[in-house]
Amino acid sequence: MNLSVAPKEIAGHGLLDGKVVVVTAAAGTGIGSATARRALAEGADVVISDHHERRLGETAAELSALGLGRVEHVVCDVTSTAQVDALIDSTTARMGRLDVLVNNAGLGGQTPVADMTDDEWDRVLDVSLTSVFRATRAALRYFRDAPHGGVIVNNASVLGWRAQHSQSHYAAAKAGVMALTRCSAIEAAEYGVRINAVSPSIARHKFLDKTASAELLDRLAAGEAFGRAAEPWEVAATIAFLASDYSSYLTGEVISVSCQHP
């Protein structure tokens, strides 16, 4: 694994100076680790979490080696309420505060409804939707008593809006993330908290490469105006904007990160 980055990717503008940012599902080379890297480049300290302990440690070490800010890591299974609560508690204990939560965890699959088991449906909904609820709840319980407000950014998907064969469980979960984003944003406003979501179309990462065929990936990429998938850092840049004070009048919004043909 190599987290080295191009200059245009790492160049920061201080958007998150002094902030503490938590990113879930941040092990490896996908959107989570790219978001942590972008947050560091923008002046934040970060806490990354994942249930893959070894990969999480490796990612934390490589992020730390960039020399951009403090990096902590917490092993966390987002399907466990106790572990999610502990993630937020550990962050505030170690870092002294929490400013931004990025809910990045998700799980997909390729199964038609007629062939899908209850367990498969439940697992995808738990990881991709209920985990967002768990972490949002834990963060809001902290933010409502904090004097500085906060930000939550959720990772949804264009499949929350669009139909795709064999993706009913994942699409339903991501549509739920969009609805949770909008509804919780109304509630959180009284705490000075903003909640938004990004909705990527197709972004390259190892999990996608393993679960989707080369033919499917090529077909999906061909549907983009640029004829390619997004790089994780391109999604992370939008997340950083939503986490920053430059989006201070945005809440309850779902921002599409795609270049779809009209």
Swiss-Prot record:
Q: Which GO terms describe its molecular function?
A: oxidoreductase activity, acting on the CH-OH group of donors, NAD or NADP as acceptor
Question: What pathway or pathways are given for this protein in its record?
Answer: Steroid metabolism; cholesterol degradation
Q: Name one GO biological process term.
A: cholesterol catabolic process
Query: If you read the UniProt record, what top EC class would you report for this enzyme, in one word?
Result: oxidoreductase
Sites binding NAD(+) sit at D50, D77, V78, N104, Y170, K174, A203
Q: What does UniProt list under activity regulation? A: Requires the presence of IpdC.
Which residues carry out catalysis? Y170
Q: Which key words are in the record? A: Cholesterol metabolism, Lipid metabolism, NAD, Oxidoreductase, Steroid metabolism, Sterol metabolism
EC number of the protein:
1.1.1.-
Per its record, the protein catalyses: (5R,7aS)-5-hydroxy-7a-methyl-1-oxo-2,3,5,6,7,7a-hexahydro-1H-indene-carboxyl-CoA + NAD(+) = (7aS)-7a-methyl-1,5-dioxo-2,3,5,6,7,7a-hexahydro-1H-indene-carboxyl-CoA + NADH + H(+)
Return the InterPro entries for the record. NAD(P)-bd_dom_sf, SDR_fam
Family (UniProt) = Belongs to the short-chain dehydrogenases/reductases (SDR) family.
Q: What does this protein do?
A: Involved in the final steps of cholesterol and steroid degradation. Probably catalyzes the oxidation of the 5-OH group of (5R,7aS)-5-hydroxy-7a-methyl-1-oxo-2,3,5,6,7,7a-hexahydro-1H-indene-carboxyl-CoA, leading to the formation of HIEC-CoA.
Would you tell me the protein name for this molecule?
Answer: (5R,7aS)-5-hydroxy-7a-methyl-1-oxo-2,3,5,6,7,7a-hexahydro-1H-indene-carboxyl-CoA reductase
